[in-house]
Amino acid sequence: MKIGCVDVDGHNWPNLCLMKLSAYHKGRGDTVEMWRPEGWYDLVYKSRVFTDTYSKDNIYIANADQIIRGGTGYGPGPDLPDVVEHQRPDYSLYPQFPDTAYGFLTRGCPRACGFCIVSGKEGRRSHQVADLSEFWDGQREIKLL
């Protein structure tokens, strides 16, 4: 399968979900790349962290058999399946961010800020969801999300 990835936010920060989906599909032998308007894709993932107040989804895709949209920017929805969630991210999807690892050690937040959906989606208690070894492979920098 040929898989395309669209980072709808595209604001100088890699999309962790897309990197995990890329790793999953590459592990199955699929070809994965950032989506381009030319060519044809079997499947395109559009991932969005922020809502319209920050990132408008003006990306029209007409060159794919199937399009899957996901992420908090599209509202509540299903979580990634565990087999994808616990993949080591495919950092090659974002070569402009070399030698940096990205991931979550915990989920949830006790603060419940009005502008943020995290406490409503993930709970008001912080709980461990991963070990550092799940997303770090010796990179010089680690960014915890």
Model-flagged regions — what are they?
Residues 38, 92-95, 134:
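Short boundary motifs at domain starts and secondary-structure transition points
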Residues 55, 90, 128-131:
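General structural signal for secondary-structure boundaries
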